[in-house]
């Protein structure tokens, strides 16, 4: 029975039983605690917790699931997969244990003709939680299972939770006995290879708290209603019904293995375990990568993007280890599409994008792999020559940090080479790097000598931010800090230039930098007896997300802790910042409208008149896409959409479609910014305009890459946009005047001039190459005979580039015939003793036979000119730093040839 038929029978069975069919959710949900959807019930969690009322009493779905904690085990055995399909039926306060057992048993054992899977009831076993007598009794009553085929297990095996706080409850698992070929009898508690788990019925009745293991967590209490959550492994049922030994032989994964086998010189399942592991890695990871890309993930350096990158890199390297030297990822994606497309049509409809992203990662990683593999070989050789078998943490860190070689690949390659890696040392160096980066960032941001100095104020309560409603507020000074140390008073001239002066107020209208929006500037002035005190606010930062630190320059008077003050945000600055921030929301919405929902925000910066927006996307935008994004943005600005801000419960806000950043931690109650109804809805704590027209024109300046899979759009807004356009207009007018053509003809005129310039450059290059060829003829004519060896060893003109030298030595060597011949050319620099000295050596086969290899001869040149070089026996090159040694270098070469030849 094919997998698509297994899926269809499952859904049909439960729909006939009154369940609502619910499509699979994306493997990515707006949940900062969950990297990927890893169970069928995840999309129903709000229903199970009673946070939302389900629109149906019972449901059924087949959910895409991804689990990557044991990614390193994939392929080593046939039990692990990173992607799998979880078929499930769910009851929200409707049926409970009896209904779940009856429905599952019927589907498994009903005949194929009656819509079931036709499994032999005598081969089915069940496990229940230790004290769940009710479930054990139902298995005997409903299914007729004898007591010896119902086994009891503890919390680690038969008490289910997601591994994080949320729903939980006792479970009952159904196993299929695959027979004595797979191990000894005795049931699941004895052997889970022979007795294969195919379905887990969770009797979800409690809510769990935090914990560190499967058994160590607190049961917080009962859920509002008793629920059922079941999960049947589609791939596992497929291997049983298709009569194959493991999931890699099923109709979904075997086509991928067959594709690889057609390209690799060594086949699958030919007695080579290492090769079989590589085949299975490619099959599993290709499928998971395609699903991730289809659901909007792009390769990156952290979070979900890093998982995808790691999967693709393991695919690529496994193919290399199978001696597949040509690109294969595109073919793999097509095979996944063909196998999985009937169940997941997005793999076909979005194939061009999926393929483009995957192939781009292959191209980039092949470059890294080529250089990194050579470097690793050097490290491995040095490690062995030192008489040890452990690659140092320092070497592993250098490979990672300097050359971009992933630690996972270093670990794999070390293992294959019979070495281990000092992971502890590597992790410590990584931690040190992160600490340095964090400390540097903190120093740049806060310049705090001792953060504990602020602890008392942090504990006393948050600063009240009034800036959403007013730009001027009366406040009281809670604390004064000079260079990170608390003081009772600060006066004009008291702090030296290098010191930072910070005022902490109980309330403030000045916005503290956060959410991509830079801080307000403004003033803090004394009141009453302190009316002469005035400070310019140059920056506002947060401590512990609650305390506003106003960095100030005290311009007059003095400030005393406890005094009343008036804090004022600069109105012009704030207006520009709000234009930038609201403009960012508009550009984000336009990006998603033009590019689709996969264009997900990765960062932003908003300052007066300017915005910068980073988003996940593979490849540059076309001119047409840039134009569309700019047009959609400005159309929305001109529509004068109302801007509404309000607070809402996090789950309700997400249900409204509010955009949330993955990896961000949000409180239960969040602030929502809505522009033009559905046009833009985001979770945001920043300041915004009242209507979209107040943003003013938006001009996109450009779009660029800032990392693999991340693009950046920059734009001017408001008056800055107008000024930019005015400059562009003036520039165009100046060009038109200089070129003596109307403005509309400038592009054609410039293109014509560029073509003429290219033609002139080609003519100059032809003349230069003719000069180089003439030099080759002259140099060959000056060949000298040393023993049995012809030698051309000459100083060349400073105009010769390293590429010219390589061309010359090849030409000259070809003119010297079949006798032993060596050519060595050094370009004499024109810049004096500080200039670089390039040199190239070539040796023909006859010279190499005498032991005169270019890679050895070049060392004599390098020594004399204080340089270095390398290459192969036929051709080597290098450069030095000592032009005065050129003559000595050529003489050293002559001496070596005289010695050998």
UniProtKB/Swiss-Prot annotation:
Its EC number is 6.1.1.7. Keywords: Aminoacyl-tRNA synthetase, ATP-binding, Cytoplasm, Ligase, Metal-binding, Nucleotide-binding, Protein biosynthesis, RNA-binding, tRNA-binding, Zinc. Zn(2+) binds at residues 581, 585, 684, 688. It is found in: Cytoplasm. Binds 1 zinc ion per subunit. It catalyses: tRNA(Ala) + L-alanine + ATP = L-alanyl-tRNA(Ala) + AMP + diphosphate. It is an enzyme of class 6 (ligase). One of its GO terms (cellular component) is cytosol. InterPro entries: aa-tRNA-synth_II/BPL/LPL (IPR045864), Ala-tRNA-lgiase_IIc (IPR002318), Ala-tRNA-ligase_IIc_anticod-bd (IPR018162), Ala-tRNA-synth_IIc_core (IPR018165), Ala-tRNA-synth_IIc_N (IPR018164), Ala-tRNA_ligase (IPR050058), Ala_tRNA_ligase_euk/bac (IPR023033), DHHA1_dom (IPR003156). Its main location: cytoplasm. GO terms for biological process: alanyl-tRNA aminoacylation. One of its GO terms (molecular function) is aminoacyl-tRNA deacylase activity. CDD domains: AlaRS_core. Its cofactor is Zn(2+). SUPFAM superfamilies: Class II aaRS and biotin synthetases, Putative anticodon-binding domain of alanyl-tRNA synthetase (AlaRS), ThrRS/AlaRS common domain, Translation proteins. The keyword GTP-binding does not apply. Catalyzes the attachment of alanine to tRNA(Ala) in a two-step reaction: alanine is first activated by ATP to form Ala-AMP and then transferred to the acceptor end of tRNA(Ala). Also edits incorrectly charged Ser-tRNA(Ala) and Gly-tRNA(Ala) via its editing domain. Belongs to the class-II aminoacyl-tRNA synthetase family. Consists of three domains; the N-terminal catalytic domain, the editing domain and the C-terminal C-Ala domain. The editing domain removes incorrectly charged amino acids, while the C-Ala domain, along with tRNA(Ala), serves as a bridge to cooperatively bring together the editing and aminoacylation centers thus stimulating deacylation of misacylated tRNAs. This is Alanine--tRNA ligase. The gene is alaS.
